[in-house]
Every structure is written in C-alpha cells, then in structure tokens.
Amino acid sequence: VIDDYAERWALVTGASSGIGAEFARMLAARGMHLILTARREDLLKELATDLDTRHGTRTEIIVCDLSEPGEPKRLFDEIAAKGIQVELLINNAGFGFVGTIDETDAERMQQMLRLNIAALTELTYLYLPGMSERGHGGIINVASVAAFQPVAYMPVYSAGKAYVLHFSEALWAEAREKGVTVVGLCPGTTETEFFDVAGVSNWLK
C-alpha cells in the first residue's frame, strides 16, 4: 500500500506516539510528505523535527481531538485550505480500557466510540471519493487482533475493532476497481501507551 507514494501526502491520525509515530517514521523514510495530527502538540513538534532532520520531510502539524464531534470535518477542511491533496490516509487514532460494562463510565465509552469508530468512518467518507475520482489512493484503518473474537472486559473495544475490520474489508471490495486500496491492519500486542491508558500496563510484563 505504501510503496508508490513518494513525494505525495499522507495523513496520520494519532501520530504523537506508538503505532502512529512509527507509521510517520516509515513513510518519511520512503519520501512521503506528512500531515500529523493528535492532541499533544509538543510530541507532534518533536516528531516533526526529528523527521525533518533525518529525512528532510515536509510536515504539517494539526492539533485535533478526533473524539470531539465536528473535529474530523474541521481537520479535513483545514488540510484542504492548505491546498494539500491527501493520497494516503492512516486512520490510527484510538484507545481502549478494561472493565465490565456496568463499571464503565458512560461518557468515556461514548468518547471511545466516537474516536475508534465514528471519526475513522467520517475521515474515510471524506477522503475516499477524491481518491476514487483520481483513480489512486490508499487507506489503512488500524483495527486489532481483538477484532477476531469477543473480548471479555473489553466488550465495546473489541466490538468496535470488529467494525473497523469489516468496514475495511467491505471497502476494499468496493474501492479496488477505482484504483484505491483499503486495508484493515490488525496488530497484536504492541508496546505502546495504549496499555497505560487502558490501565493494564502490567499485561506487557
């Protein structure tokens, strides 16, 4: 998916750390220009400086909380206003937490659904038509191995990742004839801040 995009623009969500930051490093090494978005401006600036030093990467930073309604469209509009054409979309932003459904804070659950599902879907909806019209583009939606089975104590998270996987597979079939590649990426256990946020950093030991 990422081998023929040199000198083109990629948008990476959740780019401040973990898998998103690694995607940014990998794409920069392949000669792509990057739009990096996340909530933490300091980490985005640090990453952009490092990529410029190592690869001379053209980088735009947009601070954005995609779990907030309206933010995916604001991000899309701000990028369009810069005259940037996104050829590769990495929908990586997301989080999870552990607990039974009756222990779950309702607002935190809604925040996770908005970020893991709604924002990913909206950004795909916004960018896919342009890619299809141009006959070229790629979308990588980061799911999880949790997509393949129900996970007790993470029921909403695992169900959400199943959505991401099935959504991606369906779009792969729809978009491939238009020159657009859609991939659902399902990482296994990866040492990132995810486990700290989920309150289960001991799982990595």
Question: Model-predicted segments: where are they?
Answer:
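The beta1-alpha1 cofactor-binding region of Rossmann-like NAD(H)/NADP(H)-dependent oxidoreductases
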Residues: 41-42, 63-74, 106
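Active-site helix of classical SDR
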Residues: 124, 160
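Conserved glycine-rich cofactor-binding loop
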Residues: 9, 16-17
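SDR active-site lid
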Residues: 166, 172-205
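Substrate-binding pocket helix/loop in short-chain dehydrogenase/reductase
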Residues: 100-101, 105-113
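Residue(s) in the substrate-gating loop at a strand-loop-helix junction
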Residues: 144
